[in-house]
């Protein structure tokens, strides 16, 4: 809806705020679920009742627009060909990021002396970092117009290199900082670029594709990364992080190869 109601110059800031709220919501939901789980494991699922509160907000504040697909917008294949740089970028971004939550806790427990609660705090801190980055994302887009497209894959690579090379606490903290920055930049950036490229038709053309790519990446990440790590690093628990580095490089190459599409319009 942001692409429908707001001009391109406002969208980067608003997309960043949306991403920040997404991260903060994850932190809040995780904390509430943790408290409920202490009462009983099945009570943790009550966190989904927050959806009722969200439903009230939707009914009260979201506009009652009917967004029909514009004539000549094409179907699924046409839109995929048109916006594949952003769609592929979102898929790779989610594959890179979800290697972290699906492996970090298990690897830390086996390779460090950290308490499970400390590991949880570190993981929550990553979401906080991503939220803070989302808040300032609009300014970053204006300041680094030409290079911001490379930030997410580079910070993913740096973060996973920290994990892969050392299990020490400082290395883990720095790695989480880098990955939080990468996630805080990557999602709003890809949404913003696609939204600007599609204009007011974004809600019915590229945004559904980005949403599908986002969830596909989350689903595919462990299915793809874990078997590869098991094959190439069968006796190395940190091997999964080297696979994450490889996917980060692939993400960086994709950003470079599609750099013309992923560029912001020139300043007026």
Residue ranges: model-predicted function:
Residues 1-22:
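Cytoplasmic helix-loop-helix junction between adjacent transmembrane helices
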Residues 45-60, 239-256:
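Symmetry-related core transmembrane helices of the 12-TM Major Facilitator Superfamily/SLC fold
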Residues 62-87:
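Juxtamembrane intracellular "pre-TM" segments in multi-pass secondary transporters
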Residues 83-124:
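Extracytoplasmic gate region of multi-pass secondary transporters
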